Amino acid sequence: SFLSDWKIKKTKDALSQVNLHPTFRKIINIKKESRRRATFAAKRTKKGSMVGFHGRASDIIVEITECPVSDPILLSGMPTFSKFALLGSSRKAVLRISATVSGKSLDVKVDNGKELSATEISKFAQICNQSKIIRLMWNNDVIAQSNPPSQTMGLAQVVPPSGAFLQATKTGETALVETVLEIIGPAKRIVDLFSGCGTFALPISNKAAVHALE
């Protein structure tokens, strides 16, 4: 497609300027509504609350009702995020809400929230139970969890830390893993630097000994 060819050309031109001329693989285009993680901004307003994304290089929150690239499960959390802003933030504070899809559920990490009382924590747990949120971390403390928010990596089920980096789409992750497995070929000893949660190390471990570092 025009867009794929344009992206490859832009990358080739940039690398050629530093005398690098790698072989390029075909670009894999990901279908819409497949992004599985996003960071929302939420705050109280005079009339209630608002949830959206920060404008580029801006403190302005752009309120959204839809997002064509995001998994619908992500967007299903927005009414709950609005409640978080109403109940868990001061008038001037903006909540940073990092949400990740885990199966049919959500793993959510909230930063910049107010300190919660025991009664408020209980209320938030009830809110989560009425939504798709299976784990809620509030200012670095897990205050609600009904099930472990696991991710499949190779043959393993991994529960990443709240807000941990994952490839934006599962399809993209699968393509990268398949490419890495192809590149390492029959090698039996592998070192994985910056291994994160094990995106590459765990699938590789099915065929080789892996020393993973982060």
Which sequence ranges carry the predicted segments?
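Accessory RNA-recognition modules of RNA-modification enzymes
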Residues: 1-214
